[in-house]
Swiss-Prot record:
The gene is Wfdc1. It comes from Mus musculus (Mouse). One of its GO terms (cellular component) is extracellular region. Residues 182-211 are annotated as: Disordered. Residues 182-198 have a biased composition (Basic and acidic residues). This is WAP four-disulfide core domain protein 1. GO terms for molecular function: serine-type endopeptidase inhibitor activity. Keywords: Disulfide bond, Protease inhibitor, Secreted, Serine protease inhibitor, Signal.
Length: 211
């Protein structure tokens, strides 16, 4: 029994030693592959921030431009001059002229929702701004800086009347619902009360015609 037990222990020890060496060999065989995979991941992470920005690239051409495949290739925007981006030219990535970013819409006046009946609401779009047109409603002895017809002065800085600083703003297009009121005010200025020329207002009795 003693000899039999020693043989069994030797056999178990041999099997354990064999399994240990086999596992070590397997790990050593897998180690280069793992290191290579880690190296590729680090390379991708390092170059990820230098990838071309597609939002600044022109759309790819439908037909291949001449010399597109012979152009100097790039892999990142940092390889291109200041006003160029690494973009696809139909054949390869090359330094192309950057596309300007889309314009930003400035909401000068917050639109007010209009009730359409029931649960329906209509939200107006932004007011149209007259390009580079400033205005003021302060009357300091001279004519105020008014807006053209169909526009109203949206005050951006109130100014200070005590110090003689007039307010100023930008001309924005008047809302549709205010057009009738503006027209009546304009006609009232042109034909004040007591003048023979007047116009009829809705619901204000009979209409008086111009002579």
């Amino acid at each position: 029994m003693g000899n039999c037990g020693r043989k069994v222990l030797r056999a178990l020890s041999f099997l354990l030693l064999l399994g240990s060496s086999s596992a070590q060999g397997t790990w050593e065989a897998m180690l280069p592959a793992r290191l290579a995979e880690k190296s590729r991941a680090e390379e991708v992470a390092a170059t990820g921030s230098r990838q071309p920005h597609a939002d600044r690239c022109p759309p790819p051409p439908r037909t291949l431009p001449p010399g597109a495949c012979q152009a100097t290739r790039c892999q990142a925007d940092s390889e291109c001059p200041r006003h160029r981006r690494c973009c696809y030219n139909g054949c390869a990535y090359a330094c192309l002229e950057a596309v300007p970013p889309p314009p930003v819409l400035d909401w000068l006046v917050q639109p007010k929702p209009r009730w359409l009946g029931g649960n329906g609401w209509l939200l107006d779009g932004p007011e149209e701004v007259l390009q580079a047109e400033t205005c003021s409603t302060t009357e300091d002895g001279a004519e105020p800086l008014l807006c053209p017809s169909g526009y109203e002065c949206h005050i951006l800085q109130p100014g200070d009347e005590a110090q003689g600083i007039p307010n100023h703003g930008q001309c924005v297009k008047q809302r549709r619902q205010a057009e009738g009121r503006v027209l009546r005010q304009r006609l009232h200025k042109e034909y004040p009360e007591g003048d023979s020329k007047n116009v009829a207002e809705p619901g204000k009795g009979q209409q008086r015609h111009f002579p």
